[in-house]
Amino acid sequence: MKTSLFKSLYFQVLTAIAIGILLGHYYPELGAQMKPLGDAFVKLIKMVIAPVIFCTVVTGIAGMESMKAVGRTGAVALLYFEIVSTIALIIGLIIVNVVQPGSGMNVDPATLDAKAVAIYAEQAKDQGIVGFLMDIIPGSVIGAFASGNILQVLLFAVMFGFALHRLGSKGQLIFNVIESFSQVIFGIINMIMRLAPIGAFGAMAFTIGKYGVGTLVQLGQLIVCFYITCILFVVVVLGSIARAAGFSIFKFIRYIREELLIVLGTSSSESVLPRMLDKMEKLGCRKSVVGLVIPTGYSFNLDGTSIYLTMAAVFIAQATNSHMDIFHQVTLLVVLLLSSKGAAGVTGSGFIVLAATISAVGHLPVAGLALILGIDRFMSEARALTNLVGNGVATVVVAKWVKELDHKKLDDVLNNRAPDGKTHELSS
């Protein structure tokens, strides 16, 4: 049945974002005070992410007939992530070299306020590849759930799912309990999502109120260049991948439009992770595939963040007249292939990884980060939106690759067809 426009989450979030922009622009002090509304919504979502991932992965793996299928899915997913994220890095590098948004700024690094980025540089020290891999192993199971570390929870869930599968019929009771618990958690998520318009309003009002539209003008060329690059990446690269997998990228974007609007308001793709797990399963992807690909993609398949990292690093070089030849840019690319895997789908993580990369490369002035500190928040929306679409496409592609995709269901859902073959509006 067709949902009333005013009752649809899509309309409510879009309206809330518009009101937030107006409030932040005309009453900046009041707008800046709306920050707790956005923070509270994101915290509520984070509260249920760990149990959702655990339940989805455990029931998905334990319910599979063969454990080899799980290993094959994981290997295919990691291969896909590496290829596509590398393409994203290269595209960002090419575009920023062609457009050269930082050229002519002639900024002296000595005049920049290094203190403004000191906290990010300090956090970046822990972003080494060894530290990242060690951090995947939790100090305790309770600690993994308490901290909400996605990869730690995922590791424990995979091990738990394998162990439960080996129990066979003896583990059926535990399996049923976890599946029932999963339904309760998704019920909580439905309640939280009713607050999405309030969260989007608060986050957007704060952003405009604190940083102002004027901030966009000074470094607008980089922002415009980045947004256009992200759009081209989604339409051309992800669009081509989607076409090869047998579906339209535009129909897929329409299918996840509510999630995209929530991400637009909160600047965090993590805010819709629970909903994406549910929607990708409804799209025809097997639960075990969704449970592995989506959470893992939040650290290993951040296409938008990859584009941002190469563009921002070269922009700083251009603005500060720090010469970067082919050797330096290839070195930057290699470092980013590793450091970009440590970025999570939360606001601010991309900037921390950028600080880590610039420190590792050594050729660029760390103080140059101050140039984009003020506008980083405005670019986080494009990063998060691209990351979300990228992970959704990855799930369908991996499911198709390992033959765990219901093609008829995918076609019916994306074309708004009911099981009876009739075409009408389906609730999303």
Curated annotation (Swiss-Prot):
Main location: membrane
Superkingdom assignment: Bacteria
GO BP annotation list: L-aspartate transmembrane transport
Database matches in InterPro entries: C4_dicarb_transport, Na-dicarboxylate_symporter, Na-dicarboxylate_symporter_CS, Na:dicarbo_symporter_sf
Transmembrane parts of this sequence: 4-24, 44-64, 76-96, 142-162, 184-204, 222-242, 289-309, 326-346, 352-372
Compartment(s) of residence: Cell inner membrane
Recorded topology in the membrane: Multi-pass membrane protein
Gene3D superfamilies from the UniProt entry: Sodium:dicarboxylate symporter
GO molecular function terms noted in the UniProt entry: fumarate transmembrane transporter activity; malate:proton symporter activity; succinate transmembrane transporter activity
Record-level GO cellular component terms: plasma membrane
Keywords associated with the record: Cell inner membrane, Cell membrane, Membrane, Symport, Transmembrane, Transmembrane helix, Transport
Family to which this protein belongs: Belongs to the dicarboxylate/amino acid:cation symporter (DAACS) (TC 2.A.23) family.
Entry-linked HAMAP family: C4_dicarb_transport (MF_01300)
Biological role stated in the UniProt entry: Responsible for the transport of dicarboxylates such as succinate, fumarate, and malate from the periplasm across the membrane.
PANTHER family cross-referenced by the UniProt entry: AEROBIC C4-DICARBOXYLATE TRANSPORT PROTEIN, PROTON/GLUTAMATE-ASPARTATE SYMPORTER
Protein name: C4-dicarboxylate transport protein
Gene (name only): dctA
